[in-house]
Each structure stands twice: as structure tokens, then as C-alpha cells.
Regions:
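ER/Golgi luminal nucleotide-sugar-dependent glycosyltransferases, focusing on the catalytic module
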Residues: 2-334
């Protein structure tokens, strides 16, 4: 059974849609007669031309547009007067989040990355999922379509990625980056947002972390989060000396944003336990440059080991480079 999907501006009169679940077909009533469908926009940050999932809800956005991003995507992080596109080298995908915060009207705001999507299915999966590329049925397999997205978000306040084991969030950041940067942010929070001190202490000691700067939130939560987040990050950015940093280390604000998101979610859990917060696995796309037949026909596979390795030894981190040197010295392999 195939039904046309109405735009976000239209109402749905007793429309039923089908959702396949194995051999069983479940009929899902999305909205009652006369009710307005909430507007949902999920932005996919792209710093170069890539093959991405896109539809009426999931939209690619060119990030770093002020820095020479020549992609042809209609949405760009320098549209409108209030943007931080010029800070993309330091803020990474957060320039898309800031742009939406200042320029986009919606009821739900979401953020993915051209290689990282959250699945709107497989909620029993407690690890991330690796796929080789964008293939023909990827929207169906991971619920990246309007029907699944609306069904999952109905009544949900915040959709977040599954947490990754890291030892402790404080020590993981210390091993991968300059801990003085995180400590600046934590001091700033203590001084200006003391109501977050409990969440800071709990999350920094937590052995599981939130990563990737991906989530979907209601308008109210999104704006509250952005007011808090960008106040902290701008204070950090204004005092940070970037002159001696390489192209990886300069992405400090983006790295800090991941940790601050975890603090914010922890604060919500502690202070507003009635909020509905749902965890979803992150789908990692390996090849976003082409959709050749062999890629399109390849099914996804779960890879707990790779996801855990990339969290403990993040790509480009000093710890990972140190381990590589040891491996090469012992085995003589590149």
C-alpha cells in the first residue's frame, strides 16, 4: 500500500500509512482529522559535494560557505546576516546548528553529518552501525523517511545518539585533546550557570559519552540548548590562541560542543525527568563519493569493535598516533 506524503504545511485528514516490519504490515495513524503536522527539519552538514540522503525533512546544508565551500546545495550556513560560517574551521558542523538557531523556523530541529545519520529504526541496537555507502534502500532500512521520522518523534522531546563507552568523559577528552580547553568551559559554566554543576560533575565522571553533534530536539529544547551552548563556546573562542594549531586541533569548539551536549542532556535528565529522551544508533557511511552498483547493493553490518576503537582512539588524536607508531615499530607495517 503506497500513499502520497503531504507536505509539512498541509493537514492530514484521517490518513493512514503503512510501515513494513518483517512480514507484518502495521498501519500507523499519523494524525487525527484537522490536526496540523509539526514542521521537522533535519540538516545534514556537508563541507564538500557528497551523496547524501535528502527528502522533505532531511536537507543537506553547505557548511563553511564563507571559506570557499562551492557545493551546489541550496541551503548554506552563510545565508542571512546572523551566521558564523567564517568560524567553520573551528566550530565544524556547529556552524549549521548556529545558522538554524538564528535563521530557520521549525517545530523540530535535527542535525546529522554527511557520514553520520541517526537511525529511526533498530532501537534495540546498543551500538553504532556501519554501512559501506548510500545504497538504494537506505531510507527504508533506517527509517530515514517522513513516515518513520514522524512516528518516532511523536511525543518525543529529544532524540540522541546511543552512548559510547569511554572510561570517563573527562579522561577521554584529556587523552585526545588539550584538557585546558575543557577546563575553561567547565569553569565558565560553574560561574555563569551554577545550576549545571551537578550535571558537569556527573557527566565528566560518566563512563559513557555522547558524540558526533547529532540529535533531534523540539523547538523549546533546541533554543534553550543553543542559548547556553553558544554563550559558552563564544566565550571560549574569544580567548583561545589558535596560532600554533594544526587543521585538526583547530577544531576545538566542535570537540567541546560534543562534551557540552552531554552535560546538557545530563542536566535535562536530572532536572526534568518527565521529558521523553530516546537513544538511537548512529549510522556511519563509509563511502559518500559514489553510489556505484556494488555499493548500492551492499547491506549494512553492525561493527561494535570499530565504533569502540574510534571512541577510545579518535582519528587524529595524539593517543591514536602514539599507538600507530608503536604498532609500526613492532610490526613494521603502515
Amino acid at each position: 500500500m503506497q500513499l502520497d506524503v503531504l507536505s509539512q504545511e498541509e493537514t492530514r485528514d484521517n490518513v493512514l500509512e503503512t510501515k513494513e516490519d518483517g512480514d507484518e504490515i502495521k498501519i500507523v495513524e499519523l494524525k487525527k482529522k484537522g490536526e496540523q503536522l509539526p514542521a521537522i527539519k533535519i540538516l545534514v552538514s556537508c563541507h564538500k559535494s557528497e551523496i547524501v540522503v535528502q527528502n522533505d525533512i532531511i536537507c543537506p546544508i553547505a557548511v563553511g560557505a564563507d571559506n570557499g565551500n562551492k557545493t551546489s546545495f541550496e541551503m548554506r550556513d552563510n545565508d542571512g546576516e546572523d551566521n558564523i560560517s567564517h568560524l567553520n574551521a573551528r566550530f565544524c558542523e556547529l556552524t549549521a546548528q548556529y545558522w538554524a538557531y538564528k535563521n530557520l523556523k521549525s517545530d523540530y530541529y535535527g542535525f546529522f553529518h554527511y557520514r553520520r545519520y541517526m537511525s529511526f529504526r533498530h532501537f534495540d541496537t546498543k551500538c553504532n552501525i556501519n554501512v559501506p555507502g548510500i545504497y538504494n534502500n537506505i531510507e527504508q532500512d533506517f527509517g530515514l523517511n517522513e513516515s518513520d521520522i514522524r512516528q518516532v518523534l511523536d511525543g518525543v522531546d529529544l532524540l540522541v545518539p546511543v552512548q559510547i563507552p569511554v572510561g570517563s568523559n573527562y579522561n577521554q577528552y584529556k587523552a585526545a585533546h588539550d584538557i585546558k580547553d575543557l577546563e575553561f568551559c567547565l569553569r565558565y559554566i560553574s560561574q555563569k550557570y551554577p545550576e549545571y554543576n551537578g550535571a558537569v560533575q556527573r557527566y565528566m565522571k560518566d563512563t559513557n559519552g555522547y558524540f558526533y553533534n547529532v540529535f533531534v530536539a523540539t523547538k523549546e529544547i533546541f533554543f534553550e540548548y543553543c542559548n547556553w551552548l553558544f554563550d559558552i563556546l563564544m566565550a571560549f573562542d574569544n580567548q583561545k590562541d589558535y596560532s600554533d594549531l594544526d587543521t585538526y586541533s583547530i577544531r576545538t569548539a566542535g570537540f567541546l560542543g560534543e562534551r557540552l551536549f552531554g552535560v546538557y542532556v545530563t542536566h535535562l535528565k536530572m532536572t526534568r525527568p518527565k521529558l521523553k529522551i530516546v537513544h538511537a544508533p548512529v549510522v556511519f557511511i563509509k563511502n559518500t563519493h559514489d553510489n556505484t552498483p556494488h555499493v548500492a547493493k551492499t547491506k549494512y553490518k553492525q561493527s561494535i569493535g570499530t565504533s569502540a576503537l574510534n571512541c577510545v582512539l579518535p582519528r587524529g588524536s595524539r593517543r591514536r598516533e602514539f599507538c600507530k607508531k608503536i604498532y609500526k615499530s613492532v610490526f613494521g607495517k603502515k
